Design a protein with these regions (language model features):
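ATP-dependent NMP and nucleoside kinases share a basic, alpha-helical "lid"
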Residues: 84-161
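Walker A (P-loop) phosphate-binding loop of P-loop NTPases
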Residues: 11
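Hydrophobic anchor at the beta1->P-loop junction of P-loop NTPases
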Residues: 6
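Pre-Walker A (Motif I) flank of P-loop NTPase domains
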Residues: 1-3, 119
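Conserved lysine of the Walker
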Residues: 14
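Hydrophobic positions on the alpha1 helix immediately C-terminal to the Walker A/P-loop
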Residues: 17
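Small-molecule kinase domains that catalyze NTP-dependent phosphoryl transfer to phosphate-bearing small molecules
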Residues: 68, 113-120, 132, 136, ...
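N-terminal phosphate/diphosphate-binding loop that engages ATP/GTP or pyrophosphate donors
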Residues: 23-89
Length: 221
């Protein structure tokens, strides 16, 4: 089975590019960030501070995650509820980064993520796919861009959705998540030694897509 690992910081465009690449190659796309977002959402709904590891650990036995791939798109279910849309807020994104630093949460999700890769060709994106989840992935890509470029893209997405958030706030959030993701003790964000680096700061979506498609094709034929 072929496995493609795409890692990188928040707002690098991993999910958007990964969806398109998976559709192009006919692979199943697994968005691991959605899993952490779902844990973060559950913590927020339970009135718990996502950074409080002990409080979040106590919630894990009450959480059942299920996945469905509908027309190649991953849908995630939290205790039977489709939360695929509910998890896409900035607040939940920050909560995801916080629970992502929790070793118990990472362990809770790790086997789930690995099991999804066993029976099928997959393309998985996240923060530690190439380093921890799929260390023997067929292809590893580390996707990045400057904080300013990533904040600009995210701000434009918010504008299109009618969310009026100042650019400065978006940039501050991006930088805060970068710090949290790179400084956590459990599986910090870093480039795998055998990953190919792609900086998309000066590339548009199509250019980034073609560059990644070429990287994958060169490895898998």
């Amino acid at each position: 089975m072929i496995s493609v690992a795409i890692d990188g910081p928040a707002g690098a465009g991993k999910s958007t590019l990964a969806r398109r690449l998976a559709a192009d190659f006919g692979y199943i796309y697994v968005d691991t960030g959605a899993m952490f977002r779902t844990i973060g959402l559950y913590a927020l709904r339970a009135g718990k501070e996502p950074k409080d590891n002990e409080a979040v650990d106590a919630l894990l036995p009450n959480i059942t995650l299920e996945f469905a791939f509908i027309e190649g798109e991953q849908h995630i279910y939290l205790n039977g509820e489709d939360v695929s849309t509910a998890i896409r807020t900035e607040e939940v994104g920050m909560a995801a980064s916080a629970v992502g630093a929790n070793p118990a949460v990472r362990a809770f999700l790790l086997e789930m993520q690995r099991d999804m890769a066993k029976p099928q060709n997959i393309l998985m994106d996240g923060r530690d796919i190439g380093t921890v989840v799929l260390p023997n992935a067929t292809v590893k890509i580390f996707l990045t861009a400057s904080p300013e470029a990533r904040a600009t893209r995210r701000w434009k997405e918010y504008q299109q959705k009618g969310i009026d958030t100042p650019y400065e706030d978006v940039l501050a959030d991006v930088k805060q998540r970068d710090y949290q993701d790179t400084h956590r003790a459990a599986a910090p964000l870093k480039q795998a030694d055998d990953a190919v680096l792609l900086d998309t700061s000066e590339l548009n979506f199509e250019q980034s897509f073609e560059a990644m498609k070429k990287m994958i094709t060169e490895k898998v034929g």
